[in-house]
Amino acid sequence: MLKTKVAVQVISPGMLPDDAIMLGDAYLRQWKIPQGQPLTLKFGAMRQYVKVVPVERFDGMRIGQSLARKMGLLANTTLRIRYRPEEAQLALGPLIGVLISRDDPEQRDRPFGSITMFCKELVDACEAQGAYVYFFTPLHLKGNYNTVEGWVYSDGWRKTLLPSPDVVNNRLTSRKLENRPNVQEFIQEVKIRHRSTVFNEKFLDKPEVFEALAKDPSLIKYLPESHVLKSFPMLKTMCSRYHTVFLKPVRGSLGKGIIRITKMEADAYSAQYATVGGTRRHYFSSLLKLYGSISGKMKTVRYQIQQGLQLIDIMGRPVDFRALVQKNETGKWVLTSIVARTAGSHHFVSNLARGGTLSTVREAVGRSNLSGSSSSEAPGKLQRAALDIAHGVDNFIPAHFGELGIDLALDTSGRVWLLEVNSKPSKNDNTPLQDQKIRPSVRNMIRYARHLAEF
């Protein structure tokens, strides 16, 4: 298999037969492409038999307007080209499709709302690496999965019809959208019919992650005791073991709906609720009365009950860490970034949506109440934990992931704990602490897509 980058030019009608392409003769000589014999030209799911016309002193590809339109190829695009002699196939790509939650055609400058800049970063990264990306929503999936109507960027955002992609990056931000029949049908069809790869193909529930990772003895050290809360006896047992426990919605995000339960004097308990404006606290004379106050919520919200941890803090504000791990150009997990998140005043969760602030790991650890010897070891321990956990997710959860947001914590003895694994990490939450045009996380995403598509 041979591959390189090539500039694709679309030429006027009549200059080239519809079943022919022009290619620099150096490619034909180097790759021993037979002249006069038809090849299969591939772009995403689209395939077309073509004859190759060699052109001297030319290092690009020329394709007629009619064939380019049929293949979904845009003019003046630099792509990677791959030749497989055993299949007599010339492929252009990779063609990457990003499945997003919604679009707004009326907002031409910001058709994807708050993630528009992230989408433009992907476009720029693809241009630099010789890939092509488009964006589509569940509403664009109409049943013919050979082609998809999607958004492309060429001097502005516009919609066009494109082949189904080589690689799909699932960036849907709601389980309701992800579970739509047309989305699930599309994912299965492109994987089976077109041999496309879909990564980050599903959301992760908290109990699913903890139960899976507990199968690996080497990962148990990172796992606070956790269970799905089903009854009062379970709450009573956990509260007898730990001074503080947390109730977290199984399918929650951004710190929404978390309840911290703390044992007070005698048999009294306090329950603190995370809200946008701060923490709301209620007191109960018994654990049974506290349970009665949440049992109504439990009819509609499943909770994970988790061991409370004595986390490091800065002036009483808890600190945790968000690691972004991604697969690289060889398919191996690497740590792309890790940042510290310090809870806002009057909050016990650190999410930015709840007033948290970002800093580097070393800065946060250095300002925290962690002892000096543990503090110097903390960055390395956090990095190792993030990669260990990513491998565990790969090994024990039957789904394909290319990036994970892993929330970690340090207790006051310097031990690393897992809080949560997110298969759809928010791009805002992972904003680097330095300003760059294209984030490393975006470059890595394209490199991994190239690896999957073998470009």
Where are the predicted features?
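Glycine-rich phosphate/pyrophosphate-binding beta-alpha loops
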Residues: R341-V349, N422-T431
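Active-site nucleotide/adenylate-binding loops and adjacent lid/helix of ATP-dependent enzymes
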Residues: L2-M22, R29-P38, F186-R193, T197-Q306
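Redox-cofactor binding/interface segments in oxidoreductases and associated redox assembly factors
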Residues: V98, N169-N170, L247
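Conserved N-proximal alpha/beta basic substrate-recognition cap immediately N-terminal to
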Residues: R110-M234
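A short beta-strand motif that forms the metal-chelation/ATP-contact edge
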Residues: R322, L408-S423
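A long amphipathic alpha-helix within ATP-dependent nucleotide-binding catalytic cores
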Residues: S285-A409, P440-F455
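Short beta-strand segments enriched in small/hydrophobic residues
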Residues: G93-D104
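Short beta-strand-centered segments at strand-helix junctions
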Residues: L2-L92
